[in-house]
From Swiss-Prot:
Record carries keyword Transferase: yes
Broad class of enzyme this protein falls into: transferase
Gene designation: kdsB1
Annotated compartments: Cytoplasm
UniProt record similarity statement: Belongs to the KdsB family.
Biochemical pathway: Nucleotide-sugar biosynthesis; CMP-3-deoxy-D-manno-octulosonate biosynthesis; CMP-3-deoxy-D-manno-octulosonate from 3-deoxy-D-manno-octulosonate and CTP: step 1/1; Bacterial outer membrane biogenesis; lipopolysaccharide biosynthesis
Catalyzed reaction equations: 3-deoxy-alpha-D-manno-oct-2-ulosonate + CTP = CMP-3-deoxy-beta-D-manno-octulosonate + diphosphate
Gene Ontology molecular-function annotations: 3-deoxy-manno-octulosonate cytidylyltransferase activity
Top-rank lineage group of the source organism: Bacteria
PANTHER family the UniProt entry points to: 3-DEOXY-MANNO-OCTULOSONATE CYTIDYLYLTRANSFERASE, 3-DEOXY-MANNO-OCTULOSONATE CYTIDYLYLTRANSFERASE, MITOCHONDRIAL
Organism this protein belongs to: Burkholderia ambifaria (strain ATCC BAA-244 / DSM 16087 / CCUG 44356 / LMG 19182 / AMMD) (Burkholderia cepacia (strain AMMD))
Protein name: 3-deoxy-manno-octulosonate cytidylyltransferase 1
Keyword Nucleotidyltransferase appears in the UniProt entry: yes
Function per UniProt: Activates KDO (a required 8-carbon sugar) for incorporation into bacterial lipopolysaccharide in Gram-negative bacteria.
Main location: cytoplasm
Amino acid sequence: MTHPQPFIAVIPARLASTRLPNKPLADLGGKPMVVRVAERAREAGAQQVLIASDAQSVLDAARDHGFEAVLTRADHPSGTDRLAEVAATFGWSDDTVVVNVQGDEPLIDPVLVRDVASHLAAHPDCAIATAAHPIHDAADVFNPNVVKVALDARNVAMYFSRAPIPWSRDAYLPHWPDVSAMPAPAFPVHRHIGLYAYRARFLRTYPSLAQAPVEQAEQLEQLRAMWHGERIAVLITEHAPEAGIDTPADLARVQALFRPGSK
């Protein structure tokens, strides 16, 4: 019998949001969104669930619902930087697996959270694990808001991009630049899922890594790690996860799911 990989779940929760202010505290069936996310992380089997925020109101909401919370600085440029501060505060051992569960994904599948943690443990040569799923629609391939990942033979990431990668020259070039005429991909194309597991030793080094030109160009923080030589193992799942909450319309959609009697 195999035992689940022990891991710690950290939920970065930033109160300031241009599109949806006070997002972590948005009500979902009588509980704040960040608490709903923490419940999912607990269902995944995390040994410890931490909510990390620069806002006292978020910490209070977490503690009111029985979750551990830690105050972090307000000037972090990314969720990974916030996790790095938490890792330094708690002094976790080098091989501790830390999963970054996004604070705006109250419908995240606990099984996926657990599987990404286990995937990192199964790849000792990688500092990070994440997930991706196949996409079959040309509109997704060419959508810059859909992040794609190119993989090697071991499903280790070669590159992440908002551009259509891999580029199928023979299929796409005859139609370029008419994106609407592009055929569906006839080869594997994978959409990145923004769920990460890290080794604590990597988190301690992350803040000292200079930002990479490709990271700044693509606005994808995982490219900083790759730029500095770290490897990212990618777990392939066949199904897309539930979408996170970025806009008032997203919030209304998810709030409806938490109403009594909804399925």
